[in-house]
């Protein structure tokens, strides 16, 4: 059995931050569950370009509001209780609105190792 708290993970190397977001990676590839689980905060009044060419992701909004814009497609509002699934390696822009950051629960397949950050194209590489 694996038991971890968000606070424990936040105060460790499992917390990764960039200019527009931070991710607390609670479950990683080396946990051997076949997926990874993160609590990600999208900072207020930001836009992040993301394109997971190597991963599928499902995201559940726990707090805050914003939107996701699929490149070449539609824009969808995000608020608490919204689940979106990037099942086609969808290139997208994730935006948190001015008044509050968004806190999201994220699941990745294949699982990430924990060291990944988005490259210049918004992609996470596949790491062993």
UniProtKB/Swiss-Prot annotation:
CDD domains: cupin_EctC
The protein's annotated pathway: Amine and polyamine biosynthesis; ectoine biosynthesis; L-ectoine from L-aspartate 4-semialdehyde: step 3/3
Reaction catalysed by this enzyme: (2S)-4-acetamido-2-aminobutanoate = L-ectoine + H2O
Highest taxon of source: Bacteria
Pfam families hit by this protein: Ectoine_synth
Gene Ontology BP annotations: ectoine biosynthetic process
Function text: Catalyzes the circularization of gamma-N-acetyl-alpha,gamma-diaminobutyric acid (ADABA) to ectoine (1,4,5,6-tetrahydro-2-methyl-4-pyrimidine carboxylic acid), which is an excellent osmoprotectant.
Name the UniProt record assigns to this protein: L-ectoine synthase
Organism from which the protein derives: Aliivibrio fischeri (strain ATCC 700601 / ES114) (Vibrio fischeri)
